[in-house]
Swiss-Prot record:
MF-aspect GO terms: methionine S-methyltransferase activity; pyridoxal phosphate binding
Catalytic reaction annotation: L-methionine + S-adenosyl-L-methionine = S-methyl-L-methionine + S-adenosyl-L-homocysteine
Name of the featured protein: Methionine S-methyltransferase
E.C. number: 2.1.1.12
Family to which this protein belongs: Belongs to the class I-like SAM-binding methyltransferase superfamily.
Organism: Wollastonia biflora
Annotated function: Catalyzes the S-methylmethionine (SMM) biosynthesis from adenosyl-L-homocysteine (AdoMet) and methionine. SMM biosynthesis (by MMT1) and degradation (by HMT-1, HMT-2 and HMT-3) constitute the SMM cycle in plants, which is probably required to achieve short term control of AdoMet level. Also able to catalyze the selenium-methylmethionine (SeMM) from AdoMet and selenium-methionine (SeMet). May play a role in phoem sulfur transport; such function is however not essential.
A Pfam family that the UniProt record links to this protein: MTS
Subcellular location: Cytoplasm
pH dependence: Optimum pH is 7.2.
UniProt keywords, alphabetically: Cytoplasm, Methyltransferase, S-adenosyl-L-methionine, Transferase
Amino acid sequence: MAAVTGLYGSIDEFLNHCSQSGDSAYSALRSLLERLEKPDTRTEARIFLAHLQKKLDNDGASQRCLETYHFQIQDIYLDRNEGTGYQNRKKFTMMVIPSIFMPEDWSFTFYEGINRHPDSIFKDKTVAELGCGNGWISIAIAEKWLPLKVYGLDINPRAVKISWINLYLNAFDEDGQPVYDSESKTLLDRVEFYESDLLSYCRDNHIELERIVGCIPQILNPNPDAMSKLVTENASEEFLHSLSNYCALQGFVEDQFGLGLIARAVEEGIDVIKPMGIMIFNMGGRPGQGVCKRLFERRGLSVNKLWQTKILQASDTDISALVEIEKNNPHRFEFFMGLVGDRPICARTAWAFGKACGRISHALSVYSCQLRHPNEVKKIFEFLKNGFHDISNSLDLSFEDDSVADEKIPFLAYLAGVLKDGSRFPYEPPTGNKRFRDLIASFMKTYHHVPLSTDNVAIFPSRATAIENSLRLFTPRLAIVEEHLTCNLPRQWLTSLEIEQTRDSKTPIDGITVIEAPRQSDLMIELIKKLKPQVVVTGIAQFEAVTSSAFEHLLRVTREIGSRLFIDISDQFELSSLPSSIGVLKYLARTPLPSHAAIICGLLRNRVYTDLEVAFVISEEQTIFDALTRTVELLQGNTALISQYYYGCLFHELLSFQIPDRRQTAEREAENVEASDIDMIGFSSSAISVLSQSELSVRVTEKSSLLHMDVDQIFLPTPTPVKAAIFESFARQNVTETECDVTPILRQFILNTWNFSVEHSAEFIYADFPLALFNKLVLCCIEEGGSLCMPAGSNGNYAAAAKFLNANIMSIPTEAEVGFKLTAKQLSSVLETVHKPWVYISGPTINPTGLLYSNEEMKSLLTVCARYGARTIIDTSFSGIKFNSQDWDGWNLDASLAGLTGNPSFSVCLLGGLFFKIPTGGLSYGFLVLKSGFLADSFRSSFSGLNKPHNTVRYTAKKLLELGEQKGNLTGAAQGQEKLLATRLKRLKETLENCGWEVIEARGGVSVIAKPSAYLGKNIKLEKDGSTWVTKLDGTNIREAMLRATGLCINGPSWTGIPDYCRFTFALEDGDFDRALDCIVKFNQLVK
């Protein structure tokens, strides 16, 4: 009888040892494996196993071997025909032990599904099998398809050891000699087995896979505590066997169907599989085929069902966990009575039928899955696994229309990259995101052969905004606007009949009259010739859009009569790799755009978000271009960054495969100017005043490297909950209106924050930025014939916007002794001289000083406003961040307003922004609360044309407000931010004071004001690029001097409205803040 040297004297001795217990048998088999692993004892050990199998067969013990000796050796026959590879072998010799799932219908069906793939699927590929059990499928794959490597993975350490024994059993014949395949390799060259929790072994060892196959448990353990035990080699056989039957909760939405482990396997597979890799999974049909299929599709995989059959439910598997799920869930699992039943029964019925000794079955399918956008989906899941696991339950990458998937998945990948790689959103100029403008110019150059530069493209929130801003910039006496483009214009423009002004009047009057006109060019041109408007805004009819003749005719006529022309190409412009021909762009390809004309294009045609809009304007006249971009800064604040990212991603997809600069741009003909532009209408007087005198943002150029301490934006690291909310808003599909409705929780937020009760009759109005809402209030003030009263020391952007709109502004003096706060005495002295006052108050945090109004101070100001019947705008947009405020008890607006009597026209509105306290950078959300009676109905047309936050932003806002109410991670992030900003303020104050500035210490917000006392009256001389700049420093040039000398942007006295006082914001990125302090020190040294 065979023996193993140094281990067992005979087979009987080996069997006697194994018969003692399962642990004894496993110990004996592990010792045998050690002999198989050593080349010098391998042959002897393999011969011993051959003799062992023969003895068990000859003794008739093979059928009861598992009960008697706690192991079993059996042959598995797979091929019907003559096999290939291993000398026409048709069988596999396999060993099992009690703690391993026995090969049966479940795994055989899985192999049959794999078998339906073409032979090339595994050839020379790197493969992993999840839940390999005793390894027979891994070995079968290696034998039949000759892969490069198969990794058999199982969480059960005993299964891995038995798999190695089975590998040796089949890699060597009964004489202990290696069996070679057609490539002269053995199974040992192709297969390896490792203990691994799903794909952790491959992930930890940086193994990229081309194929993943898995046949893993899909029923929750009836005893959840059992699954929390540590998986060790010495664990009980019952526990180890349960790993083959049951799974634990995995934290996925699919847990409710018992599919959580499969879901985790798929997501881990996405991480390690190569882009064109394939995953094949056995799916029990108990949850229903739709649920099983959706598990894969919502993770961005296309699914092919290879094989489906029915199998009997394993008698040792307890389905009571599924019964419990059905109790609290309308979903019903699918079982069948026997193999021939064709009507499904629920888990509860199946459980009862099984208890009554009935046989129940369920469908079993084999799914082959492949990533539809592999690189992008991988990037999405790479982002999710880094602290954003909860979002994966909201992720939905299933699309019925491939074109929708082709658009949305790349954007989600891009957004994931932005959120993962960037700790914060960068500063974006009002002109628009530089990358986005580059992409638009490149698209025009590549697809339409129009040689535009980035400096010819300005970004607007929408087409309607671009049109209204253009009209406000010029304030024409008469404008003709194509009828389809007038819907968002102010109603009074469309009803005015003041068109009898003399044509010789070169100075625009305040009122704008808009005449609607048809789009057809011959009718439009006839109106232009008869009415002689100063501005024309029109599109091109579809039947005229292909050629440039209609556009050229419009150019010629408008030039002859001195009209400015804005052409809308939104309806013809296509984001496509084969865009339709557009006559306007054909003209631009051969001729520069005339100075009196500009092109407006609203991007409306995306396949995912039909209501997500952004627009761009093209002008090749620098003065007009600069002025148009300033209107965005003055009237809207900026264009929503996420919208620019979305359309930028679409442009990028259309350009990414193109070879840059492959085609030489054709030379354009010089513009044939037949008339002088002198007769053209110029900018309105208020626009000229603001553009020439107000302090606006510094233009960013290719060569400039500026530091911005002049921007009301937080550039600190974006907290994880904020990133999660932003991504989830785009990752989800079919978001309901209720999930986006901010109003209920905002009403509660306002009550909790400022003790301001907002009744249900109050109106909430939303916009992308608070500045846009402020401007609409200014227009209401103008329409009422009121005066806008603003304290000296108000936000310079708001003051400039009100001037641009030509409001009647009354400045309320403030004094240094009280930190330039507005006092009741000063307010009263102004209001007693003003008719129909509108009072603007920034609070509790005052921008720009950073001081706080106490509750008593606010009550006294509201009392004065009530006495004089002032409409009062309380702007909370810059409030939320507080420090050095231990003695500040907050506001109680309800109490302050209670009992106030006076002029009946007194009313209060609340202006605010949701994201100022939270560093969201790229997001903004403005709100305006109008209590009943604040505005007459006739004023409401002033609010037309507002750019409302997109549903994704609304969803994010609601999510963050809810998180704030829960006092969780988001609250901690906000508190940490306040501590950081308090430290920043201290450092900035010390630096400024050491350099000769007088600082008024802030108590909140992100800005502080200071007076350059040590520099006033001193000369400074700067030399750069061969030129010299010399000046005597004063309040009018201190900002320019700082910028020229150091590249640091600050706000000067003309912005703060306080003589000699400049503003510094300090919510910069860490490195930028340190460099900004260095600039302040450098400037001090230069002046000295």
